[in-house]
C-alpha cells in the first residue's frame, strides 16, 4: 500500500502555481463553499483573501461599506475563517468520537465529461467508526478503519458516506489568531456600534434651551 499524499488544496487536475500562505489559516470560499488554505491582508480599508493554490484573479474582497448590513454579517464572515484542519494521523484514529467535526477531501467532477476530478474540502460530522487492525508498511503505521460521516456542506450536504483515513482532516476547536483579520472585523463591528449610538441620539427629543425655560416660567 503506497504512502498517500494529503496536501491541502491538491487537485487531480493541473493546479495553478502555489502562492505563499499565511501559516495555519483556512477559509471557506464564497464561490463554492469549500475550504482552502489562505492568507489575508487589509488594503485601502478592504479585506483581501488570497488563496494558497490559486492566482490573484481568484482573490476575494470584502468592503466594509458594501458587504456588511448588520453585525450578523460580520459574524458570518468570521465563521468563514479557522485554523488549519490537519490530516488525521493514522495512529490517532482512536481519538475520534461520534459527533466530531471533520473536514473531508471530496472528488468533484470537472465541467466537461473528460475533465479530471478536483479535490475540494467540505465539513462532515462523524457518525460511526468501524475499527480494523492497522497495517505496518516500512515501519509506518497505516490505519485501516472505516468512518461513516454525514456531510454538512458542499454538493453532498446531508448525504452519508463511508470513507478511509486518507481523506480525513480534523477540525480544530481553538479559534483562529490573525491580527489583520481580527483588526478588520473589530473595526467593522465598532462602526455598527457608532451608527447605533448616532441613531439613538438623533431619535431623542431636543432638550429645552435656557431661554425657553425662562419664558415658560414667566408665563406661569
Language-model features: locations:
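Eukaryotic chromatin- and chromosome-associated nuclear factors
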Residues: 1-220
